[in-house]
């Protein structure tokens, strides 16, 4: 399994030393009782999908870590052999100024998003949860975070239009209108809300690969 992971993300992005395993198995409040077997750091969505496909073949459990600002035990391993997927290298941001939406990868922090849209004279309704600007957008959606700005605009997920989610099998699922052929994201709540299924799940139902706000 580790050799296969190294072939996907390069060996330098598969961490197995005790210090790394301890660090990535600790959240704001506590350290997990069981350390991650390894920490895997994909650099592209394609790599992330390939990692999850490989884990599915090996039946290897995974947890997903964003900015490490969680205080809910959400990304702490609970059994031996668990792999931690570190989203820190997945930081691409695509801004659509004409239609005023932005698509981000899960490792983008609220600080990075705020700076990117601010450089174009724009801003998001929310700009970071109570755990801080170093928290990631993926983490915010995974925890249904209350953000600075929520008093006026609602929780962070209220601005979420759709996302690309990788299921445990490695299959990619696109939710919202943006998932349709030749379609763009628009208001989320027309029809069944498949997007909402993956909000607040702490990554348990699928790994968020891209989110459009």
Regions inferred by a protein language model and the residue ranges of each:
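Short, basic and Ser/Thr-rich N-terminal targeting/leader segments
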Residues: 56-58, 65-67, 159
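FAD-binding subdomain of flavoenzyme oxidoreductases
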Residues: 92-96, 104-106, 110-213
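Short N-terminal amphipathic alpha-helices
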Residues: 17, 62-64
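N-terminal flexible segment immediately upstream of the FAD-binding catalytic core
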Residues: 1-53, 57, 69-100, 129
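Conserved strand-loop elements at the edges of beta-sheets that form or border functional pockets
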Residues: 42, 64, 106
């Amino acid at each position: 399994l580790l050799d296969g992971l190294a072939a996907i993300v390069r060996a330098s992005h598969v961490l197995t030393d005790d210090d790394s395993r301890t660090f990535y198995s600790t959240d704001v409040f506590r350290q997990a009782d069981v350390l991650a077997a390894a920490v895997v750091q994909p650099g592209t969505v394609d790599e992330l999908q390939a990692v999850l496909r490989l884990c599915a073949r090996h039946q290897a459990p995974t947890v997903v870590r964003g900015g490490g600002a969680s205080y809910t035990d959400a990304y702490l391993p609970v059994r031996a052999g668990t792999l931690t997927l570190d989203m820190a290298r997945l930081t691409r941001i695509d801004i659509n100024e004409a239609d005023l939406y932005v698509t981000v990868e899960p490792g983008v922090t609220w600080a990075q998003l705020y700076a990117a849209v601010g450089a174009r004279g724009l801003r998001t309704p929310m700009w970071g949860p109570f755990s801080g600007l170093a928290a990631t957008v993926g983490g915010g959606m995974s925890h249904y975070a209350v953000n600075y700005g929520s008093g006026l605009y609602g929780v962070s997920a209220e601005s979420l239009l759709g996302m690309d989610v990788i299921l445990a099998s490695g299959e990619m699922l696109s939710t919202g209108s943006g998932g349709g052929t030749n379609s763009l994201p628009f208001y989320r709540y027309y029809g069944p809300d498949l997007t909402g299924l993956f909000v607040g799940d702490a990554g348990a139902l699928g790994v968020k690969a891209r989110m459009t706000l």
